[in-house]
Amino acid sequence: APAYAAGQAGRSPIAEQALRSRQGTYTSIINPDFIMAPQALTRKGFWMSARQDEEFRGMDIGDVDGDGRNEIVTITFTDIMIYRKEGKTLKKIHTIPGKSYVQLLSVDVADINGNGIPEIIISAVSQGIAGSFALEHKNGKYERIVSDVRMFLRVLRASGAPMLIGQQMGTIEPFQSPIYRMVWDGKKYRQDSRIRAPLGLSVFDFILDKLDPSGPEVVVAIDDLDYLRVYEKTERSIEKIHTVMGSKELLWKSDDQYGGTTNYFDLPSGMKYSNVTNEKIEKPAVNIRLTSYDVDKDGRKDLILVKNISSTGRVFKS
């Protein structure tokens, strides 16, 4: 058991490791193929593209066409756009247009089916219903290999090989359902074992990792109010963990807010979403990606996350 009190306000050893700086990051680092630096804008060799006209809602990187070079895959509200860094410029090499009624929420790049070509995995909703899908490069074009998955999908990669996780949309609240590992069965993604993460978290909220190499794997999450929380692996519900008296599952909660996003989606008529303070929210958020990496090569994982400062606040309360 940890040597610190569960849920205490002071810093635990895990928290000290996770948050060496309370100033957040200057840039969103999507996965280990991007710049690795605690302060990326001051790092020698840092590169920034020209301002893009599109409003990107998600981004990941990988060799999605099998040519040995990484592509940057982005999504807008409806479209998938693929870029490549060529010299000092960012060149758009492919656009996959979507439909106006299908809202794209997140994108991941990972070889889940094990054929050597990473899939482009999209979480999406259509008229308030989850309808995710995956694309793969075949015969010179991007083809759907999986369609209409009635789950939110996300890739976790912190502790080793990429792992696809999925979560069915709840009937009363969108994220009140268990999260499962998804595996490839030869034709589609299939639900496998349950992930031990607090019930009520969404697939967009958390990572699993050993922040301390000698410690256990923990759940690191950003809650609805943008506070960082560290949990033991558990299947207990958020409501039972977040009690006035505290709980052993909640190892630590930050004093400062991190994250921050304008990526929201509409719910079906009659459905509402309750945040950690039980306020009813009309539009749940898709959190900006958390990741972990040993930035300074000291054998311990560092958390890499965004701290956005916005004047809009949380404006979607009912």
Each PLM stretch: what is its role?
Residues 1-318:
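Beta-propeller-forming repeat regions
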